[in-house]
């Protein structure tokens, strides 16, 4: 039985069929909770034993919803990605208001927590060391490119995907601080739910790099926005490098 196989596995006994079973179980969970025309999988998917589930069963944009969809395209479940795409599209209009009112920036973004009503701002009266996460929007937008990258659906990229990616890249550029040494860094920035507010958090720079690369590639595919592409390439080339600690570790 599976319960015994789990016990054996925990003791170090190899079981490649058990690993395959869990792989397929993960696919099943996403298939069951994320189908076209419905909402994307939330913190609990569609399973919890309370009327009001933990964290209000919302969408945590600081890794949880992204993690739900990491295996979607790579395990041949492209259609299961569509609810996330539709959800991201609903964040653009309210997300534009957030970027304008909070940062005086172009484009759109989201924050740590989201819901079915288009909530994109930081939570009220909460600690900003974990609540402040303006790169949640660009991180979500990278999934738009991922969907195109797997499907090669040029119509999707042209009619839906590119505008979302471009707008997110525009926000990213506006948010960055051009330092006196000529490099760009994110300030203020945090590592999600870990540590104080500072500048140049590795997580933030990683998201910045990814969304700018996505925007550059998307504009090349469609043959549009050469002027903006040059700006994205310039910022990408001058983004402050990752920092390495005295033990050789990538600093957070």
Identify the meaning behind each predicted range.
Residues 21-32, 87-90, 94, 163-175, ...:
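Alpha-helical scaffold segments in carbohydrate-active enzymes
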Residues 18, 57-82, 91-100, 194-252:
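Extended ligand-binding clefts on enzyme/binding-domain cores
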Residues 12, 19, 31-32, 68, ...:
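Alpha-helix C-terminal capping/termination sites
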Residues 42-59, 106-159, 167-234:
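The feature captures the catalytic groove of carbohydrate-active enzymes
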Residues 6-13, 76-139, 148-149, 227-252:
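Active-site lining segments of carbohydrate-active enzymes
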Residues 16-20, 158-163:
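Alpha-helical scaffolds flanking conserved acidic
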Residues 1-59, 78-99, 223:
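Acidic/polar, glycine-enriched structural segments that form the non-catalytic walls/loops
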